[in-house]
Amino acid sequence: MKNKNKRLLVMAGGTGGHVFPGLAVAKQLQSEGWEIRWLGTADRMEADLVPKHGIEIDFIKVKGLRGQGLKKLIAAPFQILGAISQAKKHIKAWQPDVVLGMGGYVSGPGGIAAWLSGIPVVLHEQNAVAGLTNQWLSKIAKRVFQAFPGAFPNAEVVGNPVREDVCQLPHPKERFAQRTGPIRLLVMGGSQGARILNTTLPEALPQLSHEIEIWHQAGKGSQETVEQAYRDNGIADAKVTEFIDNVAEAYAWADLLVCRSGALTVSEVSAAGVGSIFIPFMHKDRQQALNADHLVQCGAAQMIEQQDLTVQGLVDTLNGLERKQLLEMACNARDAAIIDADVRVANAIKSLAK
């Protein structure tokens, strides 16, 4: 006899950009009485992260095809068929009502297995360029959602799930109301840092025509090097950290952000209401540049492509931003935010449950 509670199987893996949005939707449905289980791979971050959130996880063996040698490409169809078979066994054993694909290699075999088993599939694409797996699965999914316009021609734009403490920050008009003095510049290159930000910012800031207060997330293993770079350029009071544990606090502090434009970062800075200068990571499909483009078009951000980034160019960009414009950018960012992506996706899942 099937359990009376509705069940969702989440398929997501590989990176935080896939896993964290999946967890947000899972938590939303858990709060409404749903049972959640996860499908992932044993050698990626979901294997450790998902159980810490109290969700049981099953594993299948699957790897990406890009960059593989000829022998592995020849063997790939057999590996994919094996992964689909493994996923079907997990689905048959647990009998979910709906399957949610958030991207990563695991979503492909898992989504096909769900479709073959007659289980409705819901997709969410976090980036402005759809991943290969989601491109395939969009043809068999019952509902397809996208965080930014352009990933799919007719999919509903629902944003990315954003952590609650970021969504609850006061409006920029309230935060900026009494601010005077040096402009507060927050630099974030992700948990691994960004070498180009770590080298360019310390050179650029001493050349600015106005005072800057700096908080720089350097990434793992780079704190001392970046601190020394600031000192070498005459800035002794730069706040440099490996990581920022409380991102909401950092966004609330900042007048302006210089950062990469990963999908979750773009969604977070919009929800927080902070103007940004995006330096997209160079990728052949320009994924990060297209993620940033939505906020650039609505006046919430500026973008400098990595190949165009120079010390003098960054100096000129920063010198052109005064407090009035920073407030306008921050307000435009907040106006563009979609802060209920988890609820929207959860509602679609509920509508498909029999």
From Swiss-Prot:
GO biological process: carbohydrate metabolic process; cell division; cell wall organization; lipid glycosylation; peptidoglycan biosynthetic process; regulation of cell shape
Gene3D superfamilies, per the entry: Glycogen Phosphorylase B (3.40.50.2000)
Keyword match Glycosyltransferase: yes
Membrane topology term: Peripheral membrane protein
Pathway: Cell wall biogenesis; peptidoglycan biosynthesis
UniProtKB keywords: Cell cycle, Cell division, Cell inner membrane, Cell membrane, Cell shape, Cell wall biogenesis/degradation, Glycosyltransferase, Membrane, Peptidoglycan synthesis, Transferase
EC number assigned by the record: 2.4.1.227
SUPFAM superfamilies: UDP-Glycosyltransferase/glycogen phosphorylase (SSF53756)
GO MF terms, alphabetically ordered: UDP-N-acetyl-D-glucosamine:N-acetylmuramoyl-L-alanyl-D-glutamyl-meso-2,6-diaminopimelyl-D-alanyl-D-alanine-diphosphoundecaprenol 4-beta-N-acetylglucosaminlytransferase activity; undecaprenyldiphospho-muramoylpentapeptide beta-N-acetylglucosaminyltransferase activity
InterPro entries associated with the record: GlcNAc_MurG (IPR006009), Glyco_trans_28_C (IPR007235), GlycoTrans_28_N (IPR004276)
A Pfam family annotated for this UniProt entry: Glyco_tran_28_C
Annotated catalysed reactions: di-trans,octa-cis-undecaprenyl diphospho-N-acetyl-alpha-D-muramoyl-L-alanyl-D-glutamyl-meso-2,6-diaminopimeloyl-D-alanyl-D-alanine + UDP-N-acetyl-alpha-D-glucosamine = di-trans,octa-cis-undecaprenyl diphospho-[N-acetyl-alpha-D-glucosaminyl-(1->4)]-N-acetyl-alpha-D-muramoyl-L-alanyl-D-glutamyl-meso-2,6-diaminopimeloyl-D-alanyl-D-alanine + UDP + H(+)
Chain residues that bind UDP-N-acetyl-alpha-D-glucosamine: T15, G16, G17, N127, R163, S191, I244, A263, L264, T265, V266, S267, E268, Q288
Chief localization: membrane
GO cellular component: plasma membrane
Locations listed in the record: Cell inner membrane
Family classification: Belongs to the glycosyltransferase 28 family. MurG subfamily.
Functional description taken from the UniProt entry: Cell wall formation. Catalyzes the transfer of a GlcNAc subunit on undecaprenyl-pyrophosphoryl-MurNAc-pentapeptide (lipid intermediate I) to form undecaprenyl-pyrophosphoryl-MurNAc-(pentapeptide)GlcNAc (lipid intermediate II).
Official protein name in the record: UDP-N-acetylglucosamine--N-acetylmuramyl-(pentapeptide) pyrophosphoryl-undecaprenol N-acetylglucosamine transferase
Gene name per UniProt: murG
